[in-house]
Amino acid sequence: MAKIRVHELAKELGIASKEMVEVLVELGLDVKNHMSTIEDSQASWVKKRLSKSDEDSKKQPAQPVTRDEAVKKHSGEPATQTTQKKPDNPRHVSGPRPQEGSKPSGSTGRREFSENREQSRKGEERHSANPRPGTQMKSPRNNAPRPTTRPENRSAGATGRTDNRAPGAAGRTDNRAPGAVGRTDNRGAGSASRPDNRVTRPAAGRPDNKGSRPSDAKRPPQRTVPGNTPRPVSSPERTTEKKPGEASRTLPGGAKTAGDKKAFRKNTPAFGQYQSKDYSRPGRKSKHKRKKENIEFQTPENIKIEGSIMVRDLAEKLNKNPAEIMKKLMELGIMATINQNIDFETAEIVSSLYDVKVERELSEEEKILEELVDIDDDAELIARPPVVTIMGHVDHGKTSLLDRIRQANVVSGEAGGITQHIGAYQVTIKNNKITFIDTPGHEAFTAMRARGANLTDIVILVVAADDGVMPQTVEAINHIRAAKVPFLVAINKIDKPQADPERIKQQLTEYNIVPEEWGGDTIFVPVSAKSGEGIENLLEMILLVAEMNEIRANPDRAAYGLVVEGELDKGRGAVATVLVLNGTLNIGDYIICGTNWCRVRAMIDDRGKRVDKALPSMPVEIMGWSGVPEAGGKVQVCDEKVAKEIIGLRLSEKKIEEQKQSSRVSLDEFFQQMKDAEVKELTLIIKGDVQGSVEALRQSLLRLATNEVKVNVIHSAVGAITETDVMLASASNAIIIGFNVRPDSKARKYAEDEKIDVRMYRVIYEAIDDVKKAMSGLLDPEYKEKFLGRAEVRALFKVPHVGVIAGSYVIDGKIQRNASVRVLRDGVIVYEGQLSSLKRFKDDAKEVVENYECGIGIKDFNDVKEGDIIEAYTLEEIPREL
């Protein structure tokens, strides 16, 4: 919602900024100075309010002056006679002038204002005293500053001009002499100043030295303009305090002169002390008061918010005070300042407290990306190769099956014979292309399997006929159902003697996977990766499922896809395997993924050949990235300017998230950190060859944490182990784990000098086992008590500077020096401690066996008595395991 500043509104209405501030304050708006802002809706309301008051003022009829009244004024009759004849008009009633020093009833600010004006009249009267005969003396009021215009916003009920007003109605207090006639001027809204038509006469005597005004007989009569109403005569009972609903007097067309304004501001108390008082007529509600009660900004029904919003901005959207929003957050347990960001969910909860619906507004990044998205026309779509993901339990033959299809040997290149990377390959079968994605089956590669299920069109669930349904098989089924993709089951290893395909079908029915021959909708294909049996049938089923699902794409548009895997190659830099889902990717295109961008300099297919373009469903390796992109990230083609703009926005969001994570610590969090400090910690640095393997190893190691020992991975990245990694490990006392990477010569030498433990692995479960052993070494050991023997105290000897020595007889086992002992008295433990001395006669003894006498000294214990039993034992340490 647009806003306008106070000084801009004042300029638009032709009012001084300070006067505009006073007007807005009186109208109930919260403004501080001329730079404050108000909503456009509020500004429109103010304009309507002022224009309405102007119209009301113009509609108010002026009080006519009769000819008899004018004659009486010219004849010099006091105004009191006129008012006595018309008692129904209280405005013409004049009371006795208060004595000097008395305090008239009324506001202090008005009294001081009147005194200032009276002092200015003293000087004028002194200047015009004792004129020469024949000269004319002007009324002392002629030289006083008088307003040239009238306020617009004075309605008939608050201007003090109507004749039927009750006594005490609001009016302008003027401490004039008794019987003084009110000054007349045109009080119409927006009227210009009128000429002074007063009658002058020869001056009378000099005014008294007390500064009192001339009496009625000495003052000249004043002529009133027909149609105007005389100004009310002041009285001691009058007050000039504004009613709460009365409009401001300093509006367009009615501004005071500079002198009056300065005196008024200097001597008038703050508006707030009159704000709570009600001076309206009894039994009648002021029109302005009724209007003011309706000045309540409505809470909107719907608002739009981006991902996060500041508390101040949320309050503005809800038309609420920020303090009120902060109070609501405190009730929700969130301590947020006015300039602090809160997330979308929190803003939605707060808005729901006011029955406001919140809609998520697209961020700047999403708006830019939305412009890049082209809507494909059905006429432009053509069939594309299906993307097939092979999933299943570890060692069930997934990669061997893919090798048979590709007629390649991928398994031999994998350490330990298990797949530890996610690979993408494209094969051609009978002029039809199929893209295969091979996922790891090991437990540690859960994220890889989930990613493989999400970027695929068809899934092949591989189950070994001789092994059956295993844990990772069940996990793969869950990933398939979560991704909502069609799948078929390949029962592998049917060539083995113990193979039982029917048992596999029976087991899968427990997970609602029923074969077609049993009345279900799932295709089961028995195959043998070793002999090649059933491979042709499997490929035909894949093409059949792809044809049924109408897998299509538009090659004549800007490409987008997903990152299958990312790595940091020493010779090629950051490299990512990208699967193009739609469009065509060309050399020279700018692409973005997360916070990384790339200008495509080279593309290599799955067989190592360079290609100039990548069509839909084609996996390619792309070089030239600014950093290693995250596996599973979305790849989008755009121009260079847009790419840098989007990357800048994403980096800013990332920085904000990091600041949130490292926010100020509350007292509860501080106590929690103190408790966590008691937990031992194994600090690790992980380096790997590809992003997916690093991610899988990191998640597997973090799951090893217990209540006593936790794993803290302070750094994980793709690439070789460098000297910087060793320096970080030295500073943080960490262990470096390298997965399929090696340290360079400088890093190796530096690690030897600093005695940093660097471990290299090629199989993921070996790394997990070693870390588990290291964590076991950090656990507090368990102790087992081993009984040694008992001795009975039969005599006590006091040795100076040593203490009490217990002359004892070994009745069971043996007593060893430096053993732990406990003193038993009547079967109750009296003391536990250490032996300080063990002697046989006067010689020190290492141990004393059964049926021998000895002298035993107990450390820090002398309260030994005859008949006590001293029991000796040792504590054996037993290492713990996770």
From Swiss-Prot:
Ranges for region G5: 528-530
Residue numbers binding GTP: 392-399, 438-442, 492-495
Major localization listed first in the record, in broad terms: cytoplasm
Alphabetized PROSITE patterns for the sequence: G_TR_2, IF2
Region (G3): 438-441
Signal peptide (residue range): none
Keywords: Cytoplasm, GTP-binding, Initiation factor, Nucleotide-binding, Protein biosynthesis
Domain named tr-type G: residues: 383-556
Segments for region (G2): 417-421
Regions of compositional bias (Basic and acidic residues) in chain numbering: 66-76, 109-128, 207-219
Region (Disordered): 38-294
A cellular component term, taken from the record's GO annotations: cytosol
G1: region residues: 392-399
Cytoplasm found in the keyword field: yes
Chain's role: One of the essential components for the initiation of protein synthesis. Protects formylmethionyl-tRNA from spontaneous hydrolysis and promotes its binding to the 30S ribosomal subunits. Also involved in the hydrolysis of GTP during the formation of the 70S ribosomal complex.
Similarity remark: Belongs to the TRAFAC class translation factor GTPase superfamily. Classic translation factor GTPase family. IF-2 subfamily.
Protein name per its UniProtKB record: Translation initiation factor IF-2
Organism per entry: Syntrophomonas wolfei subsp. wolfei (strain DSM 2245B / Goettingen)
